[in-house]
Structures are given as C-alpha cells and as structure tokens.
C-alpha cells in the first residue's frame, strides 16, 4: 500500500497516514452555510478536499472512501437574509425558499469546478434528533448545563482531558482576553458556548432537549459533531450506543484555517467529552486563507467574488460557438487549475491575470489531448511521480510541474492521466471530434501533422515551393506553427512544430 504523509494541525507536523480501517477510510469536511452564493474562499476548500478525496480513492479504492461534507441550513445569517429577501413571506417559508435556492446553486457551482459529489451531504435540519441526543449525553456526563432555556457547554469540565485550547494552541487566559466584553449573564464562565438556544417568536424552532419547555435551535458547533457522528461513527459500530471509545474516532477532519478556533476547538470538546475519547479525528487538515489582488476579500472593499460570478464571466475567447454550460464548465476548470498551483496550506492570492494565464495553459493542454485523440485510447497507468507528489502532503504545485513536463514532451497519455486525477479532465471534450471548444482541431492529430510535414520537406527538396507553401499555410490555418532548421550533424533540413499560443 502506498505511503501517504499529511500535515496534521493537531500535532503541527507531517505524519504518516494510516487509516483506522483501510476498507472504510472516513473523511469529514465542514461545508457551507447556505445563506448566500458560495464565494471563492469556499471554492478553495471544496477543491482542496476534492483532490484529497480523489487521491484517497486512487490509493484505497473508490468504494472504500467515505467523504461527508455537511450543509448548514439553520443559522442566524440564514434567518436575517431570508427575512430581508422575502419580507412578504412568513419567516419559515422565506427560509425554505432561500436555502433551497442557495443549496441548488452550490451544487451546480461545485460541479462546474470539476468536483466529485461527496458520499454524503447531510443537512443540519435532518439531524436535529442526533443533536438533541448528543446534548443530553453531555448533560448526563456533567459537561453541559441548562440555564434560561439554553444548554451551554462547560469548558471548565474538560480542562484536562483534552485540554481546551490545545488544538488552537491557545491558553485559557488568551481566549478569555479575546472573548466578547458583553458576556451573557447566564454563562458560568465567559468561554462556555451554546449547544442549544431558545427561538424567538416567529423564528424557526424545534423541540428542545432535556425537557426544556420552549422551541429552540442548535448552536453551530454541535451540528458538526452530530452529523459526523451520524455519518462516520454510528454506521461503523460507534455512536452513542457504543461504550468503546476507540470506535468513536474517524480518520480525517478538514476545513478552512479560519475554522480552527472556535469551531473545530469546540467540536473536539463536545465529541471527546461525549464519547470519552482523546481525539475526535486522527488527522486534521486545513487549507490556507485566500486574498483577492493582495487584499482580504470583503464586500466593503468591493472585491467579494462568488463562484457564480467567475463561472458567468467572459475572460477567455474561443473559436467555436459554446453553450452556457460549456463556458461555465471551462471557467470552473480554469479556476480549479489556478487554485491548485498554490499549496493548500499556503495563502492564495487570487488575481484576474492569474485566472486568464491558467485558462490559456489549460487550453494548450487540451489542444495536445485533442491532437492525440487516437493515442488517448490506450490504457496506461498513472505516472508514479504524480502520485508521489500528492502523497507528500498533497503537493499540487509539484505534481502540476510534472504535468507541464508531460505536456512539453508531448506525452498526452501521461498528461491526461494526471489531469484526470486532478479533476481537470472532461473526457467528452477530448472524445468529441467536433467539440466547439477546440474547433480548429478537427481531423488533426500528431501523425497527420508529421505526414504533412514530411510531404512539405519532400516538396522543398524537389524545389516545388508553391506546393510546400500551401501545406505550411494549411497547417497555420489550423493553428500549427512550423519552425524550420537544420540537423547539426547531417546538415539536412528539419521542421519542428507547435500550436499557436492564444
């Protein structure tokens, strides 16, 4: 079995990855809160963990990897946006309209980015019973308390096992200093956080846990603990009915670096306290921040970019007539290619120029694949060097450098295999002879070009200049540029060719 090494946020070092069960490799990633269209920061996380999903599937087998990415569909931001957009509707109806629209758009956007569907995408509102049960377990074990129709987690209860703040590498004093000044009077300590809260009149609410007599809704952190339990523990022998702590740990938990504190710190506190474990997951992976043109992305700065706005932008010219779907899929793959050129843990600076450059390079890769359409029918294994690069903490920049070498060497099969693992290859574009993305490539392949060059050299040798020029012009019209030279050893005329750069 191939050795994988990843940087573990939990230990702050690279570690060999050994799954708990190689036939059931389990990955959980925090997904979006669906109150608005997803932005390119969301896109980075989605793309990074899609590549990880693809790598795990390659190593352990497609059917042996379980990837769960949750959907948060109950949140104060959702309530506020729904009320603003649909003031004519009752709030629950407005929320339903908003979340269905944004959920559908998120699915379309991620598909255009070349992402595989996760194994499961649980929605918070479908797991309220799991949340209530988990909260009641925490109350039973003395890790939570009820006050004024709230349930709060008691940070003091778990200071030593595991130490609260250890994941984020923060002391309690540091966290207290960063806490809000106006701490709710009903909290025992300022660092205690909400597991469940009452709903105001007109707000969405559900039956509360532990006999609380009013309707309420869950806190953000308990949602992920409950959904990961429901999807990655309970189906595999763990969960609240299991007394074995070792059965209540899964393999990998991922998300953006901004989630380390407080969200992931609080997830760990809840889950470890409920199950008596020292770890919630063995490996924690976080992608770095994203900036736009060197600045923090912010609506106030006017540089807030949604995935949808990129998919619908015209930043690249094509020869053929494209459908809107094809344009959006091309834009999505271009954005994906652009993001993967930065290591997932490093900050990423998104620029319009970089997107165009990435799109141009990706187009040239597809040109080669279209030329070598017949060669593409051969079945060859993925080059080990690409897997080696990705196996070392998902080193996508190094792996893409290898793909560039394949392109320069004209090795279409190796290039295509690598692109496929990266989620950059749409087979239908290569297989379709008259794909409008690459209209000038019709009936062209390297063998055809070589034959035409050989014929041109024969004509030049016979001094049939006009006929030789006709072949040159014919190939130029198809985007093929000829470069004449001489063999340094024999002195004979030679001709190299390349595709015109767009």
From Swiss-Prot:
Subcellular location: Cytoplasm
Gene3D superfamilies for the chain: Cysteine-tRNA ligase, C-terminal anti-codon recognition domain, HUPs
Main localization of the protein described in the UniProt heading: cytoplasm
Catalytic activity reported: tRNA(Cys) + L-cysteine + ATP = L-cysteinyl-tRNA(Cys) + AMP + diphosphate
Cofactor info, note text: Binds 1 zinc ion per subunit.
Cofactor(s) required for function per UniProt: Zn(2+)
Alphabetized InterPro entries for the sequence: Cys-tRNA-ligase (IPR015803), Cys-tRNA-synt_Ia_DALR (IPR015273), Cys-tRNA/MSH_ligase (IPR024909), CysS_C (IPR056411), Rossmann-like_a/b/a_fold (IPR014729), tRNA-synt_1_cat_dom (IPR032678), tRNAsynth_Ia_anticodon-bd (IPR009080)
Gene Ontology annotations for the cellular component aspect, listed alphabetically: cytosol
Keyword Nucleotide-binding: yes
Annotated SUPFAM superfamilies: Anticodon-binding domain of a subclass of class I aminoacyl-tRNA synthetases, Nucleotidylyl transferase
Residues annotated as binding ATP: 299
EC number(s) reported in the record: 6.1.1.16
Signal peptide positions (record): none
Residue ranges annotated as motif 'KMSKS' region: 296-300
Annotated binding of Zn(2+), by residue: 30, 224, 263, 267
One GO MF term: cysteine-tRNA ligase activity
UniProt motif ('HIGH' region) ranges: 32-42
Tagged with keyword Zinc: yes
First-tier enzyme category under EC: ligase
Highest taxon, organism lineage: Bacteria
Sorted UniProt keywords: Aminoacyl-tRNA synthetase, ATP-binding, Cytoplasm, Ligase, Metal-binding, Nucleotide-binding, Protein biosynthesis, Zinc
CDD domains the record matches: CysRS_core
Biological-process GO terms, alphabetical: cysteinyl-tRNA aminoacylation
Family: Belongs to the class-I aminoacyl-tRNA synthetase family.
Subunit annotation: Monomer.
Name of this chain's protein: Cysteine--tRNA ligase
Organism: Bartonella quintana (strain Toulouse)
Gene name of the encoded protein: cysS
